[in-house]
From Swiss-Prot:
Pathway: Protein modification; protein glycosylation
UniProt keyword annotations, A-Z: Endoplasmic reticulum, Membrane, Transmembrane
Membrane topology annotation: Single-pass type I membrane protein
Annotated gene: RPN1
Protein name: Dolichyl-diphosphooligosaccharide--protein glycosyltransferase subunit 1
Function according to Swiss-Prot or TrEMBL: Subunit of the oligosaccharyl transferase (OST) complex that catalyzes the initial transfer of a defined glycan (Glc(3)Man(9)GlcNAc(2) in eukaryotes) from the lipid carrier dolichol-pyrophosphate to an asparagine residue within an Asn-X-Ser/Thr consensus motif in nascent polypeptide chains, the first step in protein N-glycosylation. N-glycosylation occurs cotranslationally and the complex associates with the Sec61 complex at the channel-forming translocon complex that mediates protein translocation across the endoplasmic reticulum (ER). All subunits are required for a maximal enzyme activity.
């Protein structure tokens, strides 16, 4: 589930659109 975190720009290419990307999940 943390695969998208390794991506430089997960917001552009989110592996988990259901979560809304790691920015929504972490909030960063």
């Amino acid at each position: 589930v943390f695969t998208h975190v390794l991506q430089p720009y997960p917001e552009i290419r989110p592996r988990f659109p259901l979560v809304g990307g790691w920015k929504t999940h972490y909030x960063v």
